[in-house]
Amino acid sequence: MEKKWWKESIVYQIYPRSFKDSNGDGIGDLNGITEKMEYLEKLGVNVVWLSPVYQSPNDDNGYDISDYRAIMTEFGTMEDFDRMLAAAHEHGIKIVMDLVVNHTSDEHPWFVESRKSKDNPYRDYYIWREGKDGKEPNNWGSCFSGPAWEYDEETGMYYLHLFSKKQPDLNWDNPKVREEVFDMMNWWLKKGVDGFRMDVISLISKKPDLPDGKPGINGYASFNEPANGPHVHEYLQEMREKVLNNADTITVGECSGVTLEEAKKYARSDEKELNMVFQFEHMDVDADADNKWTDKKMDLREMKAVLTKWQKGLEDIAWNSLFWENHDQPRSVSRYADDSAKYHDVSAKMLATCIHMMQGTPYVYQGEELGMTNVPFTSIDQFRDLDSINAYRELVEEQHVFTAEEMMRYLCRKSRDNARTPFQWDDSAYAGFSTVEPWIMVNPNYKEINAKKQVDDPESVFNYYRKLIALRKEKEIIVYGTYDLLLPESEEIYMYTRTLGEEKLLVVCNFSEKEVAVEIPEEFRKGSYLIANYPEGEIKEQMTIRPYEAFVLEK
């Protein structure tokens, strides 16, 4: 297998609005990130992915961009960005930009022009259609509830927005749009950024006839309906030729709705398109087929089957990304394990062991390395996320699919705002994130869970992440070894091996609060511990795995 620096990297995702406020306005900013470079270096990560920092009206927290070559005023200036980039590079950390080019803001100059008239030179930068029988052109739904079409009175036509109505979709079939995007990407690469995380990149190519899809719980087809369209690979290969080959970059595509076969095309090892993709099949294990708003618990057997499918399916063909969390997902320790005081630390360490020991590039979302948890929201007024607020309005107030109590329960479990509360730096007011009340509430458990408390505690979740990250840098087998699942039918234990030549590792993770008896394969019984989240017990044929225990044995 060919060795690459991006396969050996550990990526840390920063959601700038919630990371560190340096100027006392309650909003995180670029200078706050610069301030914390030593913390990131201490953790051991070597790539930072920044959620969008471009100029934006902030309808969807920066994923609605009005100027790709300017910095959001709340986050600082371009000089602040340059200073942060230089500081990152001084600390041995590469910077990856969030590239949002499926859509722009409706306040972007291209769209302002596009909606003026049917013959405007920018009209074809976006996707406009006539209505059908007095309604939308098709039954596609927006990711954020309601239809994916907005009627525009100025020209009497509808424009497509797979996300909010303030995020009109770009028309990638127009070569001028592609040239504009590629030119902008080259501009950022010349500035010195090291790569791109590509937002919903699997959606950029729509089928020309825009066919109806299967309706979901709210009567609309999924926003994923256009995923993996007819020209998506052609456009990404063009991007590779005109942009990505100009620098030694890391690229990861967010590919909602991607299949294993499609992923092989996006992230083949011949590097004609992307280095890797984010797939979300494992994130859907605790959702219903047409509805994520549920408090359904994860079935570990299904989770193992999905992760194993991706581990084995991409082996020697493409590269996996490894993650439990990001800015769109709730906190993993609350979602998949036990965030109670009794089991919080071992749970967070177990989840980290399970995902970091697989083949692929691991992604750590800010606060995950502390075991930050979901938030005990009590009112819809505490939410800031468009997705959550719109879903509550649509499913409770308009369609009466759920009661207010049910929906609050689902939001507390699944809302994106669980990941977006301020980073918990210390136990001072507002968790040391800001000197004033932040843009969104602080999780009340910040006095127990914070960076200051953990950084100097050798037994903390933070220092366990440091060990895992150091091991990955030290041992090639963790990066390049092949993966094989054991005990597929166990409802509590996730056990797998990694193999590279004569070397072999055994990874054992208990996803339950039960003690579970497990037989250790013979070849590991005379082995040694590589890492463990409990005091190490004697290695023998039959071992009792303690609640949320995780360990790795080396042959």
Identify what each model region corresponds to.
Residues M1-S528, A532-K555:
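Active-site and adjacent substrate-binding regions of carbohydrate-active enzymes
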